[in-house]
């Protein structure tokens, strides 16, 4: 409730969403997600990676850990969504650069997993 269409990054330290764009570019998202059906999607959840941060903690394995963590988080989101009666599936293919541009990701942050949620 109270969430309007747009792009909302989550800031984990503040535990809040902040709207950074009020317009959702549906055609651009469809292209970036390589034809994934979005007609019934209410939410696209994009879990991003910060490999440099993970590598600072874990060395060369950090990049792999970042990918694994995104996958684990996506799995938990999928389980929770189904438990709430929502349709949920991971977008298996997408253009990294297109998704990053639509989200306005800074250099060094990359989309790892896109989860489509709806009814």
Give the residues covered by each predicted segment.
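Acidic, surface-exposed loops and disordered segments
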Residues: 1-119
């Amino acid at each position: 409730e109270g969430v309007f269409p747009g792009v909302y990054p989550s800031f984990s330290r503040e535990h809040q969403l902040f709207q950074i764009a009020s317009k959702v570019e549906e055609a651009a998202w469809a292209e970036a997600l390589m034809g994934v059906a979005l007609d019934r999607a209410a939410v696209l959840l994009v879990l991003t990676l910060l490999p440099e941060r993970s590598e600072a903690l874990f060395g060369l394995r950090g990049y792999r850990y970042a990918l694994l963590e995104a996958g684990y988080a996506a799995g938990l989101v999928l389980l929770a969504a189904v438990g709430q009666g929502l349709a949920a599936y991971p977008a298996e293919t997408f253009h990294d650069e297109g998704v990053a541009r639509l989200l306005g990701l800074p250099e060094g942050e990359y989309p790892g997993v896109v989860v489509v949620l709806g009814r």
